[in-house]
Amino acid sequence: MVLRVIAHDDAEVASVRESISAYTAQYEPLGVPYWVFLSGKDVVGLVFVGREPLQLLAPVGTPLSRFYVIDYEQPLSVLEEFLSEALKLSKTEKVDYAYVIFPAEHTSIANHLGGIGFNELANRYEMTHHLDTPIDQPGNLRFRRLAREELDQFFPLMKKFMSGSSDNVLDLVLQNLENIPEQLLDMWFAQITLFFVYLGDEIVGVLDLRPQAGWISNIGVAPSHRGKGVGSEMLQFCLKLFQDEGCKEAKLGVSAVNTRAIHVYEKLGFSIDEHLQTFIWRK
């Protein structure tokens, strides 16, 4: 079977807009081109081609592509064709790397990606906490929300406090925080909420949150304060903040091999919701 491909500026995209808008919303404001792969009238997948710092897995300016499988109900042969053709398109566009995230249950997809030159980059869980009971928050820590002009102070502490992570994607992101254009920083800052966390006058943690979505993007604790309950209190602060924002649940991601963190999250009421794998192809 041969899939049909339409580009982002093709008039036919309007006919599939409803199926793809959740994926295109974050890229279209940046002018990132994309291609839609169709089987008949069904959207099988999407490919976006742009440059860092879209994902921060490589230095700013690095050309990249991101694949999204939209319809996992398609026959395996169709999904394999999409992934193979998406990689061909990416090579034609001269990207340095391509990557895709998919549910770990789809082992046949992992096998196919391995066969066309991809390697596993990350293996992680998404965990959920249902905010249906009152949240108690200890009062040992103080949380101060950051202003935009304080980003220069935030990134160095983020690197320091999140060092030693078992998350390969996070490690790459921390390496590539330099030279991000101010316009993109403005857009990013408008979507997130950052906090410095204090014990007395000392900064002992950082938080990167999306409160309206109930999403904990990053939580970092100073190495000298790990294992002392600081991280747990920071998480409880997040849960209370999200609950006050009207969120019904809180979500976070964690490396599947980080059993210590998973245990802490489960103790606080989180449960594993989804198991995801990230595969990457490099030129």
How should these model regions be labeled?
Residues 69-74, 103, 222, 226, ...:
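Residue-level recognition of the GNAT/N-acetyltransferase active site
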Residues 72-141, 279:
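Acyl-donor-binding surface of acyltransferase catalytic domains
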Residues 1-15, 142-156, 162-163:
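A short beta-loop-alpha structural element at the N-terminal edge
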Residues 104-122, 232, 257-274:
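Conserved active-site alpha-helix within GNAT-family acetyltransferase domains
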Residues 25-82, 204-214:
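Conserved donor-binding loop and adjoining core beta-sheet/short helix segment
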Residues 75-88, 221, 227-240, 263-267:
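Conserved acetyl-CoA-binding loop-helix of GNAT-fold acetyltransferases
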